[in-house]
């Protein structure tokens, strides 16, 4: 039996549930799938109960780190969603920092019985650092709170916390409901789940497609073809490339070099254009073999710049994950692996942080010995003698 064809007619959006342990993230995920299956039956909308989401996380490898996540899919009248729910707090942290699950937006689940808790704060901070710009709040377990004023207080507290981390705390949507009651079939609470999904549909913008973004192609290999010029090969990260396009070669060297594309090839065949995801060879006019190397990127002119200093949000592998056995201190100098190459850099720890233990996550300042094409949201690994000891994401460019 052939698998059903993936329907591209609806825009696809990636979302997830975030929030403190036991506030109801997985129950809400189950409630969304179940209520949508009841209200908008389709081959995509299949009810998933708590146990099936909780018990069957997939182990994903990303940058040498194992991450457990549960994925469900569902659709509303206007969109198709992939929804990610990570079982443990450490899985969330790793997931967000490694970019394993890129979320276009997220539902922050807060139990009305507790209000914001330490991991609520941490997940909001992580969302800010890794560039999840759109959060919707679901105040869960409202059926267990009799006092209307208490609910108002909790909502105010959540909004203040979001504003503290530069989210539009006063304006973003807050939905009050009960995931468990909705799962049990209480129509009042089912209606609230539908209201939540309408809000997700309207509040989280449709993501820009990778092909619409400016060209970025990390160079993996370089060779010269006698009489034709220099070819750089790699997988197009985003954007498109066509013959006669003007491009820039960015990173590692002090000077950014401009060139013109004279040919695009894939599997030895000429292409009119290469698209995001394609493995291509790009023939470049006016570029000598020694003027381009692995670790640089080919990019749309002006779209990305080389930098040596940035702030990063990093997760340091624990000993059990194959990481370091000992902490590191200020001015630790590992290699930073960006896309296709290692560059040595030094780490400055935040004021008041004396050392970083294996298994910690921390904000660091990095200074690289060579400039690399980076921007907010670029992910990297931290390596020591070829093995991964950490993973991170650029949260702010400094110089």
UniProtKB/Swiss-Prot annotation:
MF-aspect GO terms: GTP binding; GTPase activity; translation elongation factor activity
Location within or outside the cell: Cytoplasm
GO cellular component: cytosol
Xref: Gene3D superfamilies: P-loop containing nucleotide triphosphate hydrolases, Translation factors
Binding-site list for GTP: 19-26, 85-89, 140-143
Region listing for G2, in residue ranges: 64-68
CDD domains named among the record's database cross-references: EF_Tu, EFTU_II, EFTU_III
InterPro entries in UniProt: EF-Tu_GTP-bd (IPR041709), EF-Tu_GTPase (IPR050055), EFTu-like_2 (IPR004161), EFTU_2 (IPR033720), P-loop_NTPase (IPR027417), Small_GTP-bd (IPR005225), T_Tr_GTP-bd_dom (IPR000795), Transl_B-barrel_sf (IPR009000)
TM regions (residue ranges): none
Principal subcellular localisation of the protein: cytoplasm
Pfam family, one: GTP_EFTU
Reaction equations catalysed: GTP + H2O = GDP + phosphate + H(+)
UniProt entry keywords in alphabetical sequence: Cytoplasm, Elongation factor, GTP-binding, Hydrolase, Magnesium, Metal-binding, Nucleotide-binding, Protein biosynthesis
Region of interest: G3: 85-88
G1: region residues: 19-26
UniProt EC number: 3.6.5.3
Domain (tr-type G): residue spans on this chain: 10-208
Region feature (G5): 178-180
Complex and partners: Monomer.
Biological function: GTP hydrolase that promotes the GTP-dependent binding of aminoacyl-tRNA to the A-site of ribosomes during protein biosynthesis.
Record's protein name: Elongation factor Tu
Source organism: Streptococcus pyogenes serotype M12 (strain MGAS2096)
Organism taxonomic ancestry: Bacteria, Bacillati, Bacillota, Bacilli, Lactobacillales
The encoding gene: tuf
């Amino acid at each position: 039996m052939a698998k059903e064809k993936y329907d591209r007619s609806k825009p696809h959006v990636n979302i997830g549930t975030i929030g403190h342990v036991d506030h109801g993230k997985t129950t809400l995920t189950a409630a969304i799938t179940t209520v949508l299956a009841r209200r908008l039956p389709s081959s995509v909308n299949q009810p998933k109960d708590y146990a099936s989401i909780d018990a069957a996380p997939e182990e994903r490898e990303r940058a040498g780190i194992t991450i457990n996540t549960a994925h469900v899919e569902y659709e509303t009248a206007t969109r198709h969603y992939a929804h990610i729910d990570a079982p443990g707090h450490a899985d969330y942290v790793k997931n967000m920092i490694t970019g394993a699950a890129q979320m276009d937006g997220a539902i922050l689940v807060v139990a009305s019985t507790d209000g914001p808790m330490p991991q609520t704060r941490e997940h909001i901070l992580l969302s800010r650092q890794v560039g999840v710009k759109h959060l919707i709040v679901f105040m869960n377990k409202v059926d267990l709170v009799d006092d209307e004023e208490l609910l108002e207080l909790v909502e105010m507290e959540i909004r203040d916390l979001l504003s503290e981390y530069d989210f539009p705390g006063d304006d973003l949507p807050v939905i009050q409901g009960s995931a468990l009651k909705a799962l049990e079939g209480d129509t009042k609470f089912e209606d609230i789940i539908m209201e939540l999904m309408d809000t997700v549909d309207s509040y989280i913008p449709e993501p820009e497609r990778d092909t619409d973004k400016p060209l970025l192609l990390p160079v993996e290999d370089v060779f010269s073809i006698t009489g034709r010029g220099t070819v750089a090969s790699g997988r197009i990260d985003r954007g498109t490339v066509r013959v006669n396009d003007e491009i820039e070669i960015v990173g590692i060297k002090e000077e950014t070099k401009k060139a013109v594309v004279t040919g695009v090839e894939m599997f030895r065949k000429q292409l009119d254009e290469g698209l995001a995801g394609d493995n291509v060879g790009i023939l470049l006019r006016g570029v000598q073999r020694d003027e381009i190397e692995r670790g640089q990127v080919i990019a749309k002119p002006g779209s990305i710049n080389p930098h040596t200093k940035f702030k990063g949000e990093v997760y340091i592998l624990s000993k059990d994950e194959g990481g370091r056995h000992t902490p590191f201190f200020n001015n630790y100098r590992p290699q930073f692996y960006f896309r296709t190459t290692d560059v040595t850099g030094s780490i400055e720890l935040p004021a008041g942080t004396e050392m970083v233990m294996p298994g910690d996550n921390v904000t660091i300042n990095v200074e690289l010995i060579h400039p690399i094409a980076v921007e907010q949201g670029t992910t990297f690994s931290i390596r020591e003698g070829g093995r991964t000891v950490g993973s991170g994401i650029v949260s702010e460019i400094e110089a």
